[in-house]
């Protein structure tokens, strides 16, 4: 498929379609002999399914005020590895979920998982909430520490790491959902935020939101709908679905963890989810904003992470290699800053520039030479996080 880069609007302000990105542009911005212009695609309705922090989805939410009645959205970074383990250690179907260590040692929160798959393979991962306060925290290095816990290490010793990946996660849940229908379009999946964070699962919810959109629009177009309308029927169908019920029952999970902390929040959620089945007669709200949670570096304790041992823990470069991503060198860097002065003039002295650490693939670096510090982007290391 082709990635959409811009929105196309009708004269009445409704979404008319999208424009795909140009291809064949050199790193200097010149057209190469392989140049292909973007295509303007029109549709009666456009379904936006870009995933977490989709650039068009963010634009639509802001333009149409879709989140004015919602609490602020919350995000996390999920890091995952696939391992081949010895047959005698394989427990097909075993599922382990965890919270607390190692993140709680640095005042952060999140969760972990370990799934025994087929063919002696294990998938493991760590989700780091992006409301942590210590700017020296590194999600990648926290994952490497996580694997040294005895309950995890017992399965990995003698095994081999096969793959690595990372992804941003929209995890605000039910309370942070924006209005998902707009004139000429619909938001689905993580573009809206349909992840069930209590279960650390979002594939089934994203699929269901897309199915509701397809059924709603098919019926409308079959009946002669000319397009461009704000389909309130989608919202109605969403409210009548099991998706709405599931997300509503998990509505207190994230706010409880953020407001009460890992242990008290965990106790509350155990009662809410397992005893009351998400049917408590009140709703917790979390009005905090993730990006405002960092303390200034001078007030935070620096974190020294152990070196990779090459057995259980690894460095970023060898991990990026296992993602099997590759980018054409001679193309524009799309990781552009609105204000290039912020990393060195604001973030570095105030926050020790956390972008050096919170991007798992190590895209941003600040090397120093005789001329001073330089904020450097290693585009070849980029994997599609959308942080």
Which role fits each region the language model picked out?
Residues 70, 134-137, 176-179, 197-205, ...:
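Alpha-helix capping and helix-loop boundary segments enriched in small/acidic/polar residues
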């Amino acid at each position: 498929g082709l990635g959409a880069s811009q929105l196309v609007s009708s004269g009445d302000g409704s979404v008319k379609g999208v424009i795909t990105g140009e291809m064949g542009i050199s790193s200097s911005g010149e057209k190469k002999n392989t140049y292909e212009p973007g295509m303007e695609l029109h549709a009666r309705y456009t379904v936006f399914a870009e995933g977490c922090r989709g650039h068009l989805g963010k634009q639509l939410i802001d333009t149409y005020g879709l989140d004015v009645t919602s609490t602020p959205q919350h995000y996390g970074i999920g890091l995952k590895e696939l391992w081949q383990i010895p047959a005698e250690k394989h427990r097909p179907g075993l599922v382990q979920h965890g919270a607390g260590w190692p993140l709680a040692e640095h005042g952060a929160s999140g969760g972990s998982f370990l799934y025994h798959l087929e063919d002696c393979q294990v998938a493991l991962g760590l989700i780091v909430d992006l409301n942590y306060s210590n700017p020296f925290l590194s999600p990648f290095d926290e994952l490497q520490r996580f694997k040294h816990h005895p309950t995890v290490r017992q399965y990995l010793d003698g095994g081999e790491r096969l793959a690595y990946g990372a992804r941003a996660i929209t995890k605000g849940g039910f309370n942070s959902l924006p209005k998902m229908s707009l004139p000429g379009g619909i938001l689905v999946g993580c573009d809206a935020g349909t992840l069930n964070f209590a279960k650390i699962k979002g594939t089934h919810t994203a699929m269901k939101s897309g199915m509701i959109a397809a059924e709603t629009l098919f019926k409308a177009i079959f009946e002669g709908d000319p397009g461009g309308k704000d389909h309130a029927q989608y919202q109605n169908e969403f409210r009548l679905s099991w998706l709405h019920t599931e997300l509503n029952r998990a509505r207190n999970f994230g706010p409880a963890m953020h407001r009460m902390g890992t242990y008290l929040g965990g106790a509350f959620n155990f009662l809410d989810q397992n005893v009351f089945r998400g049917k408590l007669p009140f709703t917790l709200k979390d009005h905090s904003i993730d990006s405002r949670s960092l303390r200034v570096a001078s007030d935070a304790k620096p974190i020294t992470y152990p070196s990779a041992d090459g057995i259980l823990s690894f460095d970023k470069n060898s991990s990026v290699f296992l993602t099997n991503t590759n980018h054409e060198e001679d193309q524009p860097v799309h990781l552009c800053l609105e204000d290039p002065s912020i990393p060195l003039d604001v973030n570095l002295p105030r926050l020790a520039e956390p972008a050096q650490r919170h991007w798992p693939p190590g895209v941003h670096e600040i090397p120093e030479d005789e001329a001073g510090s330089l904020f450097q982007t290693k585009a070849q290391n980029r994997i599609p996080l959308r942080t």
